[in-house]
Amino acid sequence: MPPPPLPHQVDLLERVLQTVREWQGERPPVVVFDLDATLFDNRPRTLEIIHEFVREVEEDDPELANKLLSLELGMVEYLLTDTLKACGVYRADRVKQVTNYWHERFFDDDYIACDVPFGGAPEYVRAIYAAGANVAYVTGRDVAGMLIGTVGKLRDEGFPIGVAGIELLLKPDEHMHDEAFKRGALPTLERVGEVIALFDNEPANCNLAKSLFPPCTVVQLETQKVPGAPVLADDVEVIADFRTS
């Protein structure tokens, strides 16, 4: 069980919620949420794919299978190569074999069901929506491979979806860089209302949001981030998850 949330986290989440409740602006407030490593922990997705791979190779390569079976959730890193190193898989041919198998499945509807919401995430997004905000999910997932699974997972976990005031923005092309997509997508939310808060795990996206919407409360989820990520802007807040108690 994780430790109780820090007072700073509780106060920040309540402050955003209170801003929505007391909103007096001409346009409706918009709160933006990323999905992977923000609302959802997608490391279980990687573990499931690895375990599936193990079942296919355990007879032919028991040594590789045993190494992969030693993987635990806390060993799953942002980069698969780092994850494989954590369980002792270094050989280039093995790394390539596992990586190809993983890549064919990770960005696919069928495996999104493995994702797990971070603590308090469904409840908090529901509260934001119930308080009167439009909610925008802006994700680096792509339309062709992940739209159906994403909608189903949001629904199954109790996030608001498929109702008025909910936006879901995905990349039109899986090969498009996430930051480039968000650089183009975030400004379009001006059509929906005024962006007052944004939650994302990537420092680059948080800094981008702060430059696009200076008055906005921008919050980084301290989960996983791309290696070599830029330093967070001074006025970006940091939390661990969405628990308020």
Residue ranges and their predicted role:
Residues R141-I196, N207-S211:
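Substrate-recognition "cap/lid" segment bordering the active-site pocket of phosphatases
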Residues P2, D36-D156, G165-K171:
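Alpha-helical substrate-recognition element adjacent to the catalytic core
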Residues V16-E26:
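A short acidic-Thr-Gly-centered motif at the start of a beta-strand
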